[in-house]
Amino acid sequence: MTTVDNRQDFKVADLSLAAFGRKEITLAEHEMPGLMAIRKEYAEAQPLAGARVTGSLHMTVQTAVLIETLVALGAEVRWASCNIFSTQDHAAAAIAVGPNGTPDNPQGVPVFAWKGETLEEYWWCTEQALTWPNTPTGGPNMILDDGGDATLLVHKGVEYEKDGKVPSVDTAESDEHRVILELLTRTVGESPQKWTQLASEIRGVTEETTTGVHRLYEMHRDGTLLFPAINVNDAVTKSKFDNKYGCRHSLIDGINRATDVLIGGKTAVVCGYGDVGKGCAESLRGQGARVIITEIDPICALQAAMDGFQVTTLDEVVDKADIFVTTTGNKDIIMAKDMAKMKHQAIVGNIGHFDNEIDMAGLAQTPGIVKDEVKPQVHTWTYPDGKVLIVLSEGRLLNLGNATGHPSFVMSNSFADQTLAQIELFTKPDEYPTDVYVLPKHLDEKVARLHLDSLGVKLTTLRPEQADYIGVKVEGPYKADHYRY
């Protein structure tokens, strides 16, 4: 049962969870030194004063620390989760209530998120986060996105308003596409210039993840990008830490909580060997699994082979492996015909952003197959011959659906990147014409520096003659933008 109060601008599962959420937020703050240092550094300057930030990002305890950092820097914030299963309800309740409110008198941030949303509820929540009552355009002037759904809704709204019509729902390519078309049909009917007006004041978007960044580059290539974007995902302190070390932690956490199956001795297939795949493969090997990689990219395949992994095609191992994890950000990685060949009680899960890496629609259409819920976000699919597959989080992010996502320390890196990127776009609009940018190198290094003390790291300082010799400043940046780390 979700809590919605017509006097309050939020919708969460249960406000009575706020005290529990606040305790976990306090614990997380200690593990998020980057965000806390940024709060302290910018508290007086208030660089986000006047910013209206719409956030579409997993509503977790760690995200709560990000939200309260944005507020501490002067921003107003409205928030929705970017996944139907990823919200931690106690964190959402704590944000809605706020540090100075009570469940009877909430004084926090408008948040629209609960674990287990339907697709209709999910997109309604995104719409609410983008709708700012009593403002000039009725919308935000900044977006903080993860996966690009908030950005997508604005762009599709503007596109269809320009065309004068929304495509028929009969043209929808999926259930989610149908829901988006229904939402935009309603909003365009109610207010024919809603999205065009809303988009006019947006100074920019900062995008968290690979999938959303891919969308941004596509829109820029096609000439349809409406406002500048910072690609936070490809900041070194995001992709080389969150994607690798975060997944190394949270993949195993999700599988363990979901199944309680011993991983040691099992054969696990990791589809993709990018930063996420590398972290997943390392964690599975650390548990004693025999890990096999599938890859399309010869460079990543060579890396996997040099790291000691067998690299082959899914067809070669689909009937032999015990665990399958997709990490690619692409679609149709494991199809229904592949799952039909898997072993009894094979475990299938995804840690890429969307739910289209695993062909869940095709699986559901298999003649005679029966779906049964073991517990939330864990389902068995039983074939007519009695074979059972265990599918995690219905093909969505298993580390957030079956567990609580990445740990606080690694998210402090990513969310410090996000905060600094928001400050960049909001305070320097003249320096960022419409394009897709990466986080400036000096800010990337700053985020890393903010996390060293808590790990007991002591940096060596360049002498001036050494700095001159390699052509850098004593205080950095130390690497060229093309350096790969």
Swiss-Prot record:
It is an enzyme of class 3 (hydrolase). Its cofactor is NAD(+). GO terms for molecular function: adenosylhomocysteinase activity. Its EC number is 3.13.2.1. Pathway: Amino-acid biosynthesis; L-homocysteine biosynthesis; L-homocysteine from S-adenosyl-L-homocysteine: step 1/1. Signal peptide: none annotated. It is found in: Cytoplasm. One of its GO terms (cellular component) is cytosol. Keywords: Cytoplasm, Hydrolase, NAD, One-carbon metabolism. Substrate binds at T60, D146, E208, K238, D242. NAD(+) binds at residues 209-211, 243, 272-277, 295, 330, 351-353, 399. InterPro entries: Adenosylhomocyst_ase-like_sf, Adenosylhomocysteinase-like, Ado_hCys_hydrolase_NAD-bd, NAD(P)-bd_dom_sf, S-Ado-L-homoCys_hydrolase_CS. Pfam families: AdoHcyase, AdoHcyase_NAD. Binds 1 NAD(+) per subunit. Gene3D superfamilies: Adenosylhomocysteinase-like, NAD(P)-binding Rossmann-like Domain. PANTHER family: ADENOSYLHOMOCYSTEINASE (PTHR23420:SF0). May play a key role in the regulation of the intracellular concentration of adenosylhomocysteine. Belongs to the adenosylhomocysteinase family. This is Adenosylhomocysteinase. It comes from Streptomyces coelicolor (strain ATCC BAA-471 / A3(2) / M145). The lineage of its organism: Bacteria, Bacillati, Actinomycetota, Actinomycetes, Kitasatosporales.
